[in-house]
């Protein structure tokens, strides 16, 4: 699986950080909001690590949604 594909664990982690959401590992194998949402209980250790990597990377960049 490519890290930066829309819906990937990395992408979902970065998006959760961007929108100021809590860390809640998940991903969408068929693209964001397409098909089934895979939650942490069903993710591999590598998928969970990719989610946290995306979240942490966005936190380091400080790239957040401006709601104003």
Named regions from a protein language model:
Residues 1-68:
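Intrinsic-disorder/low-complexity detector
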């Amino acid at each position: 699986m490519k890290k930066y594909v829309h819906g990937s664990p990395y992408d979902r982690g970065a998006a959760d950080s961007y929108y100021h959401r809590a860390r809640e590992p998940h991903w969408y194998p068929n693209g964001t909001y397409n098909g089934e949402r895979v939650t942490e209980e069903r993710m591999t250790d590598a998928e969970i690590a990719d989610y946290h990597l995306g979240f942490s990377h966005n936190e380091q960049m400080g790239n957040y949604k401006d709601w104003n």
